[in-house]
């Protein structure tokens, strides 16, 4: 296995298309990552460093290293091997390259918790450091009541160009413990506003005395081969409540508002991501009908 000889901070046009074709092939086989046939790669591949692995001129693997690190200070990596070239040791070689390049304490994602990833982690001495659960609910048969708000609190939808700062402020307070979500910036929100999936009508804000105290940002995923029967899927993307405003069922009310909105769009399935050790959130979502569907794992030393 060879590559372009070095880690790169940017991919040239040809490398970008080569990586896109590889990721599309991976998506066809595994259902992820969510990469489009044209345009920019998904946001998780922005910045950082890239390594493209080739055999006889054919791209067989790709690794990305987020050198900035998450809010806990861990550099985070992703690696992919083309489905037609698996079980030939390329994943191990990419992981070795990451191990040599990344800072001590780096983490690497294994989406879907595939047996091959578990085997590779065990072989190389990596341990499970984090589990991110994908929960799922069928809309048909769900009976989600109208949200009930405590006195003085009202709901409205997000206004682009007006509410970014307030959302980021609440998000930072609500997720100061979270390695990725807590790092959300105004620039990140504005970047998502430019994405095709963004829908301000599905972005709910809770206000009290004119101040935003919580939000529920929903998302709709276009059909992805190999996942959810090839249907469009709604997502409880982010629910954040200012710690000073917690209590009185505000988080539940915001969640219900988003679920009812997604159901009104004719979606038959809704998902969400939750940390595997967040027992309180798991209890809330279980009561709303969600069950475990998939698990993403971060490995590290």
Swiss-Prot record:
Enzyme type, top EC level = transferase
Q: Which residues form the N-acetyltransferase domain?
A: 6-151, 153-301
Q: Which residues bind 1D-myo-inositol 2-(L-cysteinylamino)-2-deoxy-alpha-D-glucopyranoside?
A: 180, 219, 235, 273
List the molecular function annotations (GO) for this entry. mycothiol synthase activity; protein-N-terminal-alanine acetyltransferase activity
Per the database entry, which stretches of residues form a coiled coil? none
Q: List positions binding acetyl-CoA 1.
A: 79-81
Biological process according to GO: mycothiol biosynthetic process
Keyword line = Acyltransferase, Repeat, Transferase
Q: Does the keyword Acyltransferase apply?
A: yes
Classification via InterPro entries: Acyl_CoA_acyltransferase, GNAT_dom, MshD_Acetyltransferase, Mycothiol_AcTrfase
Q: Which reaction does it catalyse?
A: 1D-myo-inositol 2-(L-cysteinylamino)-2-deoxy-alpha-D-glucopyranoside + acetyl-CoA = mycothiol + CoA + H(+)
Q: What is its EC number?
A: 2.3.1.189
Ligand binding (acetyl-CoA 2): 239-241, 246-252
Q: What does this protein do?
A: Catalyzes the transfer of acetyl from acetyl-CoA to desacetylmycothiol (Cys-GlcN-Ins) to form mycothiol.
Q: Which family does it belong to?
A: Belongs to the acetyltransferase family. MshD subfamily.
| Record's subunit section | Monomer.
Q: What is this protein called?
A: Mycothiol acetyltransferase
């Amino acid at each position: 296995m060879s590559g372009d000889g070095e880690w790169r901070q940017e991919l040239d046009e040809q490398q970008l298309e080569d990586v896109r074709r590889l990721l599309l092939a991976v998506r066809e086989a595994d259902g992820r990552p969510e990469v489009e046939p044209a345009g920019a790669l998904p946001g998780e591949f922005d910045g950082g460093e890239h390594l493209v692995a080739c055999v006889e001129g054919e791209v067989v693997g790709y690794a990305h290293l987020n050198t900035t690190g998450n809010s806990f200070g861990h550099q985070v990596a992703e690696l992919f091997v083309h489905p037609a070239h698996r079980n030939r040791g390329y994943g191990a070689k990419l992981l070795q390259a990451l191990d040599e390049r990344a800072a001590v304490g780096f983490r690497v994602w294994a989406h879907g918790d595939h047996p091959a990833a578990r085997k590779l982690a065990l072989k190389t001495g990596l341990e499970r450091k984090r589990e991110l659960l994908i929960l799922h609910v069928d809309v048909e048969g769900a009976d989600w009541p109208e949200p009930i708000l405590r006195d003085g609190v009202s709901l409205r939808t997000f206004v682009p160009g007006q509410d970014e700062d307030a959302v980021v402020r609440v998000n930072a307070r609500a997720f100061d413990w979270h390695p990725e979500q807590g790092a959300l910036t105004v620039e990140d929100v504005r970047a998502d506003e430019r994405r095709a999936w963004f829908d301000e009508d599905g972005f709910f804000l809770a206000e009290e005395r004119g101040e935003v105290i919580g939000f529920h940002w929903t998302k709709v995923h276009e059909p992805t081969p190999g996942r959810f029967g090839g249907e469009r899927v709604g997502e409880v993307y982010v629910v954040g409540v200012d710690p000073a405003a917690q209590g009185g069922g505000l988080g539940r009310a915001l969640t219900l508002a988003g679920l009812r909105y997604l159901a009104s769009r004719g979606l038959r399935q809704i998902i969400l991501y939750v940390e595997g050790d967040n027992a309180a959130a798991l209890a809330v979502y279980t009561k709303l009908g969600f069950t475990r569907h998939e698990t993403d794992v971060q490995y590290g030393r």
